[in-house]
A protein has these predicted regions:
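Conserved catalytic network of the ASCE P-loop NTPase/AAA+ motor domain
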Residues: 201-205, 228-229, 255-263, 278-280, ...
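A short beta-strand element within the Helicase C-terminal
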Residues: 278-290, 300, 315-319
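Conserved helicase core region in the C-terminal RecA-like lobe
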Residues: 217-218, 267-274, 293
Length: 383
């Protein structure tokens, strides 16, 4: 019943109220003063209800994508969402509520991390002062547009908001407790079983190197552990270490590198940070462990190994497809098919990239692809 809780269908919503409403991201819906609402209207004078609903929907989609990525990533995302919801509850109970689109309030309220970093105990009140200082700085710099970054009190919100937050927190906590006890992940098991016989099949993987993409850092870390357990040398790249590891990437995976080639690593496992702007074409096998949010990224990922200068005759692309339940919510398969079909039509591509259905798909391309990117997408990696 996990999907029913995190992303119910309209029919399921009629049968039960036990599903997440993502109220942590809907505070602006509950302002009592219309003047505060006007600070947060969207483009085209969209009301706060529409803005909040869109943000909540993005967080819902992200949670579904984390579930599709790996059970480890999903469980960690539940833990994060529980903490973020608890932060809002704590602000309410302390009568100090921050709504700050330009400030990472959840990061600022992580007093345990701040205590470790500063080497002295940091309290909730210390964190509050940090946020106030950031708001003041934004205002002084003329960057606090319409006063969107502001501090409020309980009286500025409808009382029902607190009740809804508590209900969300209960559902998230119960779901997390269940998933924290679940060691099974069939997708991950299938990956481990196919590392050597399929991904390193010498008849296909003639380069002896492999590129793996995933959007979730927790998934990347799990994949790295599995690859290393099979005896392969894995290089893990995220935004945190991309720059410092650039030379290592070139030495081990760039077929155009003019220096001495190295084989310190035969697998590179990365997030979207390497989806563009880098050569990885000493490898000729790529695995998309999860399908990217923007289907154009799929082509960009594959373009890392399918490049001029490759020494291998063929490139092999493997994809883990989303489940039917998950894709009913995020529609990644449909968007990927549509975008890739448009490439085939426009550029005469004759290689099937995502599935056998590509050459016969005839969706309304403009309708399916339009709106993939959201102005609120900056929030989606929060989980």
């Amino acid at each position: 019943d996990t999907m029913t809780i995190i992303a119910p269908t309209e029919a399921e919503k009629l049968q039960t109220d036990e599903w997440l409403k993502y109220f942590r991201y809907r505070a602006i819906e509950y302002f009592t003063d219309p003047a505060n609402e006007r600070k947060h209207t969207g483009r085209g004078n969209r009301g706060v209800n529409d803005v909040a609903k869109q943000l909540a929907t993005i967080m819902q989609i992200l949670l579904v994508k984390r579930l599709e990525s790996s059970f480890t990533a999903f469980t960690q995302s539940l833990l994060n969402l529980r903490r973020y919801t608890e932060n809002m509850i704590k602000m309410w109970e302390n009568d100090t509520i921050f709504v700050c689109p330009q400030i990472d309030v959840n990061k600022e309220l992580d007093y345990e991390a701040k205590t470790l970093k500063r080497g002295k105990r940091v309290s909730f009140n210390d964190c509050v002062e940090d946020i106030r200082a950031k708001i003041t700085k934004l205002t002084e710099q003329g960057r606090n547009e319409k006063g969107q970054n502001a501090e409020y009190n309980r009286k500025d919100f409808k009382e029902e908001y607190y009740i809804q937050l508590k209900e969300d927190f209960r559902l998230i906590s119960n779901l997390y407790d269940r998933w924290a006890k679940n060691p099974q992940d069939p997708k991950f098991d299938a990956f481990k079983e196919n590392i050597k016989p399929e991904l390193f099949n010498p008849q296909k993987n003639t380069s002896g190197k492999l590129v793996i993409f995933s959007e979730a850092i927790n998934t990347v870390q799990s994949l790295a552990r599995a690859v290393k357990a099979k005896g392969y040398k894995a290089l893990v790249i995220t935004a945190a270490n991309r720059d410092e590891m650039e030379h290592t990437i070139e030495e081990n995976f760039d077929a155009n590198y003019e220096g001495v080639w190295k084989d310190d690593y035969n697998v590179i496992i990365t997030t979207e940070v390497l989806a563009e702007g880098v050569n990885l074409h000493r490898a000729n096998v790529i695995l998309n462990y999860d399908t990217p949010w923007n289907s154009t990224r799929l082509m960009q990922r594959i373009g890392r190994v399918n490049r001029i200068g490759s020494k291998e005759p063929f490139v092999y692309v493997y994809n883990f497809m989303p489940s039917a339940e998950g894709d009913a919510q995020i529609q990644l398969v449909r968007k990927a098919h549509t975008k890739l079909q448009s490439f085939h039509v426009l550029f005469g591509e004759d290689s099937k990239i995502f599935s056998e259905e590509e050459s016969v798909v005839h969706y309304d391309i403009a309708k399916a692809v339009d709106g993939e990117e959201s102005p609120l997408q900056k929030y989606v990696y929060e989980l």
